[in-house]
């Protein structure tokens, strides 16, 4: 029995079990891309039914691969079938219901099945209908942003678990998709990477391609993880190199017409763009990393609470558009502004609004809190990274850690900005107001934490005095707790960027 016959036999068996449930069966992946290699590849299928699969149908389907092998001993294909079986409605709308899953590690009856964005693109671009009505017109083509997210997750898995040559092909295909937005067969991706000199270990990639082409004969597929790491470094750089394609796709999602797109900054997975059109210019911020996308929700939160922000124009789940400060009623602050008492007064008014309007929200919603970083584990990290284990201060802190944490947690909470610096500050051109932007570190905390943060960055005693006078009363007992809490938190966060922290301990 050859591959095509095995696919037909399996299709017939599935249809027989689901005959009263109008099954639609798709084949996609390496078989359709003419890249199936026995000993390496799977046979990817998707089975969608008119209504939820019954318990009886599920019990027959879940072990069908094994049953087919019993009927056709020695068949090399039946164990390679993988995929999900569920109703079309549940699959398309991502609902939970009785689902049959076949995977490399086994099979089970579960409650959902989802194809990642790369698999969905394969299904919609090149999938073959084996049986039933074609319903792909009801499915949504994955976004380029979704593909980037899935590729990033796959690269992290490669870094952690990559000890076989196949990971090199996965990374090569990821680079191809980042550059083109399209899916390519794994073997072709490896060859493309070689032709374009993308893999730092060309010999390893050549071996990988040979292994895939002769998978049935070449049993040795192991590889040193350091080779995977080096190629993963290449694709990490590719995320930055393809940031413009990402930005263009996000503008398309938001239906924003534009003439030119110019890069302002691209750092650590966050790219900032000036978008020019006949109607003027706006600024767009795109986030490759999930953890930084919280800024989108933070803008919306502040707006809902009546806290002044730059105009928030449009957004997706991974980018947003705001007014361009160069053509705004605001101007970017300079370091000189931090010494101006009049500017300090405007800053104090913004912070007072943030703290007053944010108190109820902070006390009823889970949010990032710097005090949560004060743990024995993090203190040990500080000591280890700074080589300061013998300092008496650590013994004092560790002996009183519960008291310190308890005192910090008892302080009243409100919203905290946490990141004041003049580069995050804008001042109204008519000097009527000032506000801060960049809300990635917005969280909850006690009032004095923000007051101390601002006062440390103001450039003169007069500015600090003006800020404190305008802000008004606050609980000065918070300062006593903050003297300890800020010391510990500051050193923990400093580890991420300050190699000379030990010199100041």
What are these regions (language model features)?
Residues 1-26, 57-58, 385-404:
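Helical scaffold of the NTase/Pol beta-like nucleotidyltransferase catalytic core
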Residues 25-63, 80-83:
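Catalytic metal-binding acidic patch
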Residues 58, 63-161, 174:
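Conserved NTP/Mg2+-binding pocket subregion across the NTase superfamily
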Residues 115, 122-240:
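Conserved nucleotidyltransferase catalytic core and NTase-mimicking acidic/glycine-rich helix/loop elements
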Residues 269-271, 276-366:
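ATP-binding pocket architecture of kinase catalytic cores
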Residues 334-392, 411-413, 443-444:
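A cross-family kinase active-site recognition segment
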Residues 345, 453-456, 465-505:
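Helix-rich C-terminal or lid/interface subdomains of diverse kinases
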Residues 415, 428-468, 476:
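Active-site Asp-x-Gly
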């Amino acid at each position: 029995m050859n591959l095509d016959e095995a696919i037909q036999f399996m299709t017939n068996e599935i249809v027989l079990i689901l005959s009263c449930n109008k099954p639609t069966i798709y084949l996609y992946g390496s078989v359709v891309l003419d890249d199936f290699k026995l000993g390496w590849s799977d046979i990817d299928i998707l089975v969608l039914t008119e209504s939820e699969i019954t318990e009886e149908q599920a019990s027959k389907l879940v072990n069908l691969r094994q049953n087919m092998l019993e009927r056709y001993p020695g068949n090399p294909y039946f164990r390679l079938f993988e995929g999900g079986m569920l109703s079309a409605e549940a699959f398309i709308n991502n609902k939970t219901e009785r689902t049959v899953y076949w995977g490399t590690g086994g099979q089970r009856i579960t409650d959902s099945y989802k194809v990642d964005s790369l698999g969905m693109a394969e299904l919609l671009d090149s999938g073959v209908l084996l049986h039933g009505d074609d319903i792909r017109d009801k499915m949504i083509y994955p976004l380029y942003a979704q593909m980037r997210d899935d590729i990033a997750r796959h690269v992290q898995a490669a870094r952690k678990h990559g000890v076989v040559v196949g990971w090199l092909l996965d990374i090569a295909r990821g680079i191809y998709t980042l550059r083109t937005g399209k899916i390519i067969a794994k073997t072709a991706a490896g060859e493309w990477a070689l032709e374009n000199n993308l893999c730092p270990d060309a010999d390893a990639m050549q071996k990988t391609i040979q292994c895939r082409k002769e998978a049935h004969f070449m049993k040795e597929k192991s590889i040193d993880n350091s080779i995977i790491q080096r190629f993963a470094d290449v694709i990490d750089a590719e995320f930055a190199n393809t940031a413009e394609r990402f930005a263009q796709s996000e503008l398309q999602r938001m239906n924003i017409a534009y003439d030119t797109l110019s890069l302002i900054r691209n750092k650590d997975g966050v790219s900032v763009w000036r978008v020019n059109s006949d109607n003027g210019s706006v600024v767009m911020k795109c986030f490759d990393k999930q953890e930084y996308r919280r800024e989108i929700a933070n803008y919306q939160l502040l707006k809902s609470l009546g806290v002044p922000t730059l105009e928030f124009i449009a957004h997706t789940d991974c980018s947003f558009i705001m007014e361009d400060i160069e053509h705004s009623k605001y101007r970017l602050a300079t370091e000189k502004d931090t010494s101006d008492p009049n500017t300090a007064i405007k800053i104090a008014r913004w912070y007072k609004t943030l703290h007053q309007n944010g108190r109820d929200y902070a006390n009823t919603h889970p949010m990032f809190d710097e005090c949560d970083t004060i743990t024995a584990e993090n203190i040990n990290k500080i000591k280890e990274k700074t080589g300061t284990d013998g300092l008496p201060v650590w013994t004092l802190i560790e002996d009183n850690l519960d008291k310190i944490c308890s005192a910090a947690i008892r302080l009243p909470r409100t919203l905290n900005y946490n990141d004041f610096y003049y580069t995050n500050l804008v001042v109204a051109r008519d000097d009527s107001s000032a506000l801060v932007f960049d809300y990635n570190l917005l969280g909850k905390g006690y009032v004095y934490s923000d007051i101390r943060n601002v006062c440390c960055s103001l450039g003169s005693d007069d500015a600090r005095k003006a800020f404190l006078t305008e802000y008004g009363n606050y609980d000065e007992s918070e300062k006593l707790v903050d003297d300890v809490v800020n010391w510990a938190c500051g050193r923990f966060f400093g580890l991420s960027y300050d190699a000379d922290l030990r010199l100041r301990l």
